[in-house]
Amino acid sequence: MTLSQWQPSRKSDVPLHRQIEQYMKDKILHGEWAVGTKIPSQRTLADMFQVNRSTVTAAIDELTSQGLLEGRKGGGTKVVNSTWSVLTAEPPLDWSDYVRSGIHRANSSIIQAINQNEPRADIIRLGTGELSPDLVPADTIGRMFQQINPGVLSLGYEQPKGNRQLREAVADHLKGKKIHVSPSAILIVSGALQALQLISIGLLKRDSVILTEKPSYLQSLHVFQSAGMRLRGLPMDDEGVKAGLVSSNRKQYGGQLLYTIPSFHNPTGTVMSEQRRKEIISLSKKEQMPIIEDDAYGDLWFEEKPPQPLKAMDHEGNILYLGAFSKTVSPGLRIGWLAGPEPVIERLADIKMQTDYGSSGLSQWAAAEWLSQGYYEEHLTWVRRKLKERRDAAVHFLERYAGDIATWRIPAGGFYIWVTFHKNLPVSRFFYELLKRQVLVNPGYIYDGEDRNSIRLSYSYASLGDLETGIKAAAETARRLMMS
């Protein structure tokens, strides 16, 4: 269930619980909340509406007395009636059965709460994995669109693999990373996440086991699990995942492939060492093991470049390489790319045509211009400097407010600091208490189901002032919960 950013007015003469009652009633009577819909918990609603729980309880009690809601012990509160069910003798359609039957798994409640609250203007976003609006080159992109030559712009469907000019520009860009692929071996996708979805349904069988780092961004998604696959997390050290662990888990659990973020790993910020990369490549060659290399953050280095990508050392065609503009330029462009063997690219291009007929032509044109005209490298120089300033500020605030209760490693690039508290925390309580303070964090639990004492701290989005306010609030809340 998605709630709008509506808030009751404290300036109104209408009591807060009556405003909430009317808001919820409108959702039910207009059919937005169908019969069978489970509404959020009273605590969640109180956090969303920024009122006391008793206020929400009063609104729900009134709707229950009107026959619109029904609460069941252990089953939450559901919509049981609507205008149509009152006016007709036939029972209304219960969409909840269909919702539960869908093959794609729902996000966890905490991830849903993150997604619902991120658009709020009053929220400090300490977990957001995107550039601040201040770092997005909106003016430059705007000028590019103003200078469009209609003769070179296509508004029709693109080729199955994507705009030829963009694929050529991506191929040239990858040469700078010592990755040599032809445009025909590149597929343009609507962000790296779509590439993972295509791989999950186009290349792998149900019950396949995907090996990945632990913790991992992949654990916060249900791309592979919804396609009937399982994830197997492998612990890392300071140099990344160990080749020996990959090999032993591949043998023991039948791992089909390895998914890895070797440069500025999400969520830990770890950089896989050059030696470890060579070992992983050697293992891939020896065991004929496919690897998905996600290099979304590889260009966002601060002091020095990370070791060359795995794909640059791949001479057997075992690596599927993902790149995107989502982290370096703008998530709104929805442009990424997948480089791999041509038969794989052709297979996934065919599936992509069946799902969306290609990524936005306008976005592909803009991305091609951005790469071919030199805007990208110019922007990277500036954005690296700004991100480094934010990282340094975040580390300073952590030392000031959390130095006695947590540890962390200073990342050499990317967006994230993996902060680990000295004691376990009640994850849900920690998250929602911070939300009450208008601070949004990403608990480590969503990247590793066993984690109870870490958060992924992002310095890419919040302003410096908000970083300090948010980190101070997180440290105060964690300290209090650890002492209770």
From Swiss-Prot:
GO MF terms, alphabetically ordered: DNA binding; DNA-binding transcription factor activity; pyridoxal phosphate binding; transaminase activity
Superkingdom: Bacteria
Reported cofactor(s): pyridoxal 5'-phosphate
Pfam families noted in UniProt: Aminotran_1_2, GntR
Residues in HTH gntR-type domain copies: 14-82
Keywords: Aminotransferase, DNA-binding, Pyridoxal phosphate, Transcription, Transcription regulation, Transferase
DNA-binding region coordinates: 42-61
InterPro entries in the cross-refs: Aminotransferase_I/II_large, HTH_trans_reg/aminotransferase, PyrdxlP-dep_Trfase, PyrdxlP-dep_Trfase_major, PyrdxlP-dep_Trfase_small, Tscrpt_reg_HTH_GntR, WH-like_DNA-bd_sf, WH_DNA-bd_sf
Modified residues (N6-(pyridoxal phosphate)lysine): 327
GO biological process, one term: biosynthetic process
Family of this protein: In the C-terminal section; belongs to the class-I pyridoxal-phosphate-dependent aminotransferase family.
Name this protein carries in UniProt: Uncharacterized HTH-type transcriptional regulator YisV
Gene coding for it: yisV
